[in-house]
């Protein structure tokens, strides 16, 4: 009885909030946690049309070019920790999402997907004879997977602690009725990757409590030809101790 009462009060509170601030704002509050700090890392600003759209570690004549899509918290310049996971012969470009760091815009599924596509096509244009691959962590696997719909597809995907469908993960943390009401940006990686025939490597973390490893396993099971690797640690531990090596092939 007490649980029912608490649930009822919670739902009534949410409905009141919907009327006050709208579902889109609540969705942003639940999904996106941007920071807006200056870049104090050794990463170099990545500039397109006079705007900083991310940060990079560039090498001369790279063997591969990687577009990295980070998770839902922090900002692109925080991701210096990921650079040692890449080959020293590859260039790495870490996209800044709209509304994150010093980039203008509002975080949403649509703005993330659009920014990812623009950045990817910009890299294709900049490096026309070099393989362009995509690596993503956590929520970044959503906009990353959307790139599989392009005509000129990525040469490889590496998805780290990804989800299969965002709604399924959200329902593990919040009541299902709340998710159905507010989750408009429901990335479906299973659907997005269903017709992709290229290389896909998927890393799931055994002790992940944010996106439990079963979601990485479910995604791998539905994507023909994908390679599943299970690593130790939790959601944010994948870059430790060489657990993930990001390579092509």
Where are the regions a protein language model picked out?
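Catalytic histidine-centered segment of alpha/beta-hydrolase-like enzymes
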Residues: 234-244
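Short beta-strand/loop motif that positions the catalytic acidic residue
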Residues: 196-197, 201-204, 208
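An N-terminal hydrophobic leader/cap segment in hydrolases
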Residues: 9-56
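Membrane-embedded segments
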Residues: 53-122, 142
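Gly/Ala-rich beta-loop-alpha elbow adjacent to hydrolase catalytic centers
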Residues: 135-140, 144
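Conserved alpha/beta-hydrolase "acid-adjacent" motif
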Residues: 209-215
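Active-site nucleophile loop of the alpha/beta-hydrolase fold
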Residues: 158-168, 188-189, 233
